[in-house]
Amino acid sequence: MISINKLFEEEQPKINYTIYCDMDGVLADFEARFEHFAGLSPDEYRKEIAQKYGSKQVDNMFWDLIDKQIGVRFWRGIPWMPGGRQLWDYIKPYNPTLLSSPSFDNSSRMGKSLWVKDHIPGTPIIFRQAKKKSEFAGPNKILIDDREDTIMSWKSKNGIGILYKNTDQVISELKQLGL
């Protein structure tokens, strides 16, 4: 005898999703890498720069440290986020594409590409500024990202946005979608 649940499962068509996943703050721990070099979290560093040199200098000095003084090795050496490998292992069977925001210097594109080569070789990566990620949104297209504004923009283009808070929460939301 077949259960009603079994019949219901068989009647539901399988939805083919396209998964896009952010890197920094989802898979790769940007903050830990920054703190390794600066001795302060990014927020603490920005506050210190603002106090010493004024708020107009914050972004220039922040990105100068990362892209000019450290360069490619900053990006290539970023450690996995806690739970990042677990999340990657969960989404990998669905052939995700990384959708990552680069800094304005080419060192981030080069370093992030090397990070992918070192940790998850063969994975496609697309570089887009956060505000332009929604160009890839649409029905059945999922974005996992840690920026609320990026997720809201994605959803406004009929995409499925999952705001990353932690690995378990993301996996739970993916399971709710049948993944």
Regions found by a protein language model. Give the residues of each.
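Acidic, Mg2+-coordinating phosphoryl-transfer loop and its flanking beta/alpha structural elements
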Residues: 142-176
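Active-site neighborhood of HAD-like aspartate-dependent phosphohydrolases
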Residues: 7-66, 166
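Short amphipathic alpha-helix with an adjacent loop that forms part of the alpha/beta core around
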Residues: 134-138, 173-179
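Substrate-recognition "cap/lid" segment bordering the active-site pocket of phosphatases
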Residues: 99-142, 148-152
